[in-house]
Amino acid sequence: MKPIRMYLFGTRWIDFYGVAIWFAQSRKWPAHVGCYFAMEDGSHVGFQAQHKVPGMKYGGFVSFDFAEYQKRYHGWKAKLTGKKMWVRYIDLTDDQLLAKYLKCKRLERDVLGYAHTQVFGKLIHERLGFPMQRDPRYVDCSESMAMVMAEDTPEYDVRDSENTNFDSVSPSELWANLHAALAE
């Protein structure tokens, strides 16, 4: 499986194989969006948009220990944003899911509206045909790649679901659960 290669805001190149995005909604903050990327070696690179989270750069990327991040900030984040919090997995290497992704009604809200406008701007523009302001230096992806999201990808309540309880499930187990759910 080939990775997606991305240039991180003028800092360095990374290759990553999947991404999980968490969304949290509350009356005070209608949209609180962030994501983290799974690397081949098991490490993670995180991105935070909309609001600052302690330990992460605003609107940029940092490398971090995923388990430690969740241990330190998950409780605070859940309390801040209320009950509507979930993780959605996106497979960035499977073109077969592109058709489902194109039918996703939440495309504009979940992808174009927040963190991904700059991060995947070039990819969205070239593959999906959405016009947008973008800096081509941010992303370098081959034409064979596609950012995809299954229309029926389940939503995960990260506080109530046993499969996505970050306090007790390791990152590797989490990714296995998300892959399994996407394949069903």
Model-derived regions: residue spans:
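Glycine-rich catalytic cores of cysteine/serine-nucleophile enzymes that process amide/ester linkages
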Residues: 3-91, 127-133
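Structural alpha-beta junctions
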Residues: 27, 32, 41, 106-112, ...
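Solvent-exposed, acidic/flexible segments
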Residues: 27-30, 97, 138, 142
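A structural motif
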Residues: 77-82, 91-125
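Activation targets extended, charge/polar-rich intrinsically disordered C-terminal tails
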Residues: 116-184
